[in-house]
Amino acid sequence: MPSLSKEAALVHEALVARGLETPLRPPVNELDNETRKRLIAGHMTEIMQLLNLDLSDDSLMETPQRIAKMYVDEIFSGLDYANFPKITVIENKMNVDEMVTVRDITLTSTCEHHFVTIDGKATVAYIPKDTVIGLSKINRIVQFFAQRPQVQERLTQQILTALQTLLGTNNVAVSIDAVHYCVKARGVRDATSATTTTSLGGLFKSSQNTRQEFLRAVRHHN
């Protein structure tokens, strides 16, 4: 793996140790992003031609390049730990020992089974120990792991593990409520169902009162 920030390396190692890392094959020859985009565009051209689409049409001729750029620079950018957000943690000088909750974190991800959209919101909470984290960093961590081919259960646990690792405490909880377009737009075509996943650590798992306080925050969001 290329040179990474200390925080990115720690999070990656923690996910591997827990068996929660996104399935990735070892790179045989590390490609730069421009090469990736060029090769993806070539394969996308072949796919579109197999669908009998006319790539000489001005509406379609740039589509392979647009998709390649979207994959590498946007919706799958979380596969590259070089894009892991810069994390700021500060000493807990105020001795905060109550739950800190961030609700309504918007996320858009991609189902790894069909490569269609997952659209949802996350609620994240933690009880500080020695450090506290800049609130926007929680949103950025959620977004980083969402920018991958995902299953919602793994995404929830990846966010939990990342925050536990960075904050040095197990007292973290994550809940995600999302609509899966592999259910909404194909297959059963259920336009109204949503999926909720929750991952609890430390006191959020062992203390009924703490768990209920978090779940009330989740219900408030819903």
UniProtKB/Swiss-Prot annotation:
This is GTP cyclohydrolase 1. Keywords: GTP-binding, Hydrolase, Metal-binding, Nucleotide-binding, One-carbon metabolism, Zinc. InterPro entries: GTP-CH-I_C/QueF, GTP-CH-I_N, GTP_CycHdrlase_I, GTP_CycHdrlase_I_CS, GTP_CycHdrlase_I_dom. GO terms for molecular function: GTP binding; GTP cyclohydrolase I activity; zinc ion binding. It comes from Enterobacter sp. (strain 638). Zn(2+) binds at residues 111, 114, 182. One of its GO terms (cellular component) is cytoplasm. GO terms for biological process: one-carbon metabolic process; tetrahydrobiopterin biosynthetic process; tetrahydrofolate biosynthetic process.
